[in-house]
Amino acid sequence: MAIERTFSMIKPDATKRNLTGAITKMLEDAGLRVVASKRVWMSRREAEGFYAVHKERPFFGELVEFMSSGPTIVQVLEGENAIAKNREVMGATNPANADEGTIRKVHALSIGENSVHGSDGPETAAEEIAYWFAGTEIVG
């Protein structure tokens, strides 16, 4: 199995409820290792840039508003098949459809306030990691 890195974010709805430790523990218990982490409060410009792929979607404005409404934890996770494992631990985007024991089933409030974000593939992971971290900030 290949060791890979992925991007993970704990969203404002979760940080406001002091769930950072609980969510990080779920990720680590699944075999993922945090190799970079920082707490940021996204500006509107940063949120627009990070979610630019959704710019033409009807929910874009609401997404930007939400993501700039409070602190987030941006982090790089490392482990065997880290991208797939992170997505499995997060659960379905809609918490109503998420498997029992996943982050979103346990902690999400709604499809919009679903507590976490994770990269969906290797290219996206590389882009999202580079958006928030310099290479020297990632310590494996």
Curated annotation (Swiss-Prot):
EC number(s) on file: 2.7.4.6
Pfam family, one: NDK
Gene Ontology cellular component terms for the protein in this record: cytoplasm
Positions annotated as active site in the UniProt record: H117 (pros-phosphohistidine intermediate)
CDD domains to which the protein is assigned, alphabetical: NDPk_I (cd04413)
Alphabetical keyword list: ATP-binding, Cytoplasm, Kinase, Magnesium, Metal-binding, Nucleotide metabolism, Nucleotide-binding, Phosphoprotein, Transferase
GO aspect biological process, one term: GTP biosynthetic process
Cofactor(s) annotated in UniProt: Mg(2+)
Compartments in which it is found: Cytoplasm
Catalytic activity: a 2'-deoxyribonucleoside 5'-diphosphate + ATP = a 2'-deoxyribonucleoside 5'-triphosphate + ADP; a ribonucleoside 5'-diphosphate + ATP = a ribonucleoside 5'-triphosphate + ADP
One Gene Ontology MF term: ATP binding
PROSITE patterns the record matches: NDPK, NDPK_LIKE
Amino-acid positions noted as binding ATP in the UniProt annotation, renumbered to this chain: K11, F59, R87, T93, R104, N114
Source superkingdom: Bacteria
Subunit note: Homotetramer.
Family: Belongs to the NDK family.
Function: Major role in the synthesis of nucleoside triphosphates other than ATP. The ATP gamma phosphate is transferred to the NDP beta phosphate via a ping-pong mechanism, using a phosphorylated active-site intermediate.
Name of the featured protein: Nucleoside diphosphate kinase
Organism: Sinorhizobium fredii (strain NBRC 101917 / NGR234)
Taxonomy of the source species: Bacteria, Pseudomonadati, Pseudomonadota, Alphaproteobacteria, Hyphomicrobiales
Gene (name only): ndk
